[in-house]
Amino acid sequence: MAPVGRRFRAELVAAYLVACAVCLAGQSNAAEDPLFVSKKITPQGEYTSGIEGPAVDAAGNLYVVNFQQSGNIGKLAAGASQSQLFTSLSAGSIGNGIRFDRQGRMYVADFKKHNVWVIERGETTPHLYFHSDRFNQPNDLAIAADGTLYASDPRFASPVGGQIWRITRGADGKGQGEVMSSTRRLGVTNGIDLSPDGATLYVSESNSRQVWAYRLDGSKLLDPRLVRGFADFEVDGLRTDVDGRIYLARLSAGKIAIIGADGSLQREVPLSGKQPTNLTFGGPDGRTVFVTQKEGRFIETFRVDRPGREPCLQMPRMC
C-alpha cells in the first residue's frame, strides 16, 4: 500500500487530468459551429450577380464562377475569408456549373458558348472538353463515380424544351455527349445530382418549382417520379448527401430545403441572403455546405450532420 500522502497526490493528479479532459472537450464542442445555422464567409460584392457553380476540390478549396466579372472563376482557399482569381475562360465564355472528378479534373459548363471546359489537376488553363450546337445553354453539372457528367440544359425562354445531357470521356480524352431521352417532356431543367448509388438522377425545374427523379439506363431517363413541388419561389441548384437526402436552393425564399428521397420536407435552413442560386458540400469531413448568394453576391456556409455524396466520391476514406 502506498503512503497516504503519495496516494492523495496521485488522486489529485488523476482528478486534475479528468477535469482538463472535460474542459478541452467542452472547448472543442464550443468551437464546433452549430448545425444548420448559416453565416456569411466572404465579403459582399466579390462576385457578379451570376455567382454560381460552387464545387470543392480534394484539398478543400472552393471554386465559384463569375468572380469580379463574368467569365472568371474564383477560388476560396480552405479556411480563407476572401476569394482570389483562379482562372478565366476564353473571351465570350461564361461559366455556370463546376464539378471535379476523382482525378482532380475540373469541369465547367459554359452556357454562353455551349461548351464544357476541363482544367487538369494542378493547372489553371481551360481546355475544350465538349461542344455542341444542340445545347440550349448548359447550366449545372453532376458527376458519377466513373466520371460521367450529366448536364442540365434549360431553355429559360420557354416552360418546356429543357434537356439533360450525358457526357462521357472518350479514348482521346475528349467528351462525347448525347441528349438523354425521356418519357416525360422536361421543363426548365436546372439543379441536378445523383443518388448515392448512382442509379437515380434528380433534376429541379425552375418554372414548375418541382424536383423530379429518373431511373438511369444509359442515355435513357426512365420512370419519372415527382419527388416534391413547392407552391411558391423558384427552385435552383441541388446536391445530395450520403443518405440520399436532397439539399435544394429555393431562390427568393432565402432557404435551403432538405428533402428526403421519399419527398418529405425534413428541414429548411434560413440563410443570410434571400437569393441562393446553388450549393455544394466540402470541409475536411464533407459536412460543410457552401451556398452562393445572388443577393449580395457572396458565399455563406453552414454545418450539417451527414457528408455530401461528392466528398465521399473524391475521398472515400472520410465516409
What residue ranges belong to the model's regions?
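A short helix->beta-strand "capping" segment at the edge of beta-propeller domains
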Residues: 31-47
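Bacterial N-terminal signal peptides
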Residues: 14-23
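Beta-rich, blade/repeat-based domains predominating
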Residues: 45-59, 89-106, 110, 115, ...
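Short loop/turn segments that connect beta-strands within beta-propeller blades
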Residues: 77-81, 120-124, 168-173, 215-219, ...
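A short loop-to-beta-strand structural motif that recurs across blades of beta-propeller domains
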Residues: 72-74, 115-117, 163-165, 210-212, ...
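Beta-propeller fold detector
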Residues: 84-88, 127-131, 176-182, 222-228, ...
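Beta-propeller domains
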Residues: 64-84
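N-terminal secretory signal peptides that target proteins for export/translocation
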Residues: 1-8
